């Protein structure tokens, strides 16, 4: 019996990085890309509707609809959703980021 692929959500505002993540995911049969967004607000909506088991999250979202470019706020709001599961979150950033 074949297992279901892991559902992944990408929240990334850099198009090059986003395309790199998408290309990596497309090469795998055990992973399914359920949504891609550059917005923390839309990301939370996708978590509710798509229920991803994994989230690739950019640390600094310059296109944030909430006005907050800090992804830690997204994580706090994710916790407030009180999901019946805990998605795995992978946080990404650039080497020359102010946060690194």
Task: List where the protein language model places each region.
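The feature encodes the CheY-like receiver
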Residues: 62-67, 96
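Short, flexible coil/linker segments at domain boundaries that flank nucleotide/cofactor-interacting
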Residues: 1-4, 83-84
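A short, hydrophobic beta-strand element within the central beta-sheet of small alpha/beta folds
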Residues: 76, 85-100
């Amino acid at each position: 019996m074949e297992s279901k692929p892991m559902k992944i959500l990408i929240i990334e505002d850099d198009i090059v990085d986003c395309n790199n993540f998408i290309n990596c995911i497309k090469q795998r049969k055990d992973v399914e890309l359920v949504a891609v967004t550059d917005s923390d607000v839309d990301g939370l909506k996708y978590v509710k509707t798509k229920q991803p088991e994994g989230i690739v999250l950019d640390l600094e979202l310059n296109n944030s609809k909430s006005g907050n470019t800090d992804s830690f706020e997204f994580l706090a709001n994710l916790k407030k959703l009180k999901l019946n599961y805990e998605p795995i979150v992978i946080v990404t950033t650039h080497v020359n980021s102010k946060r690194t």
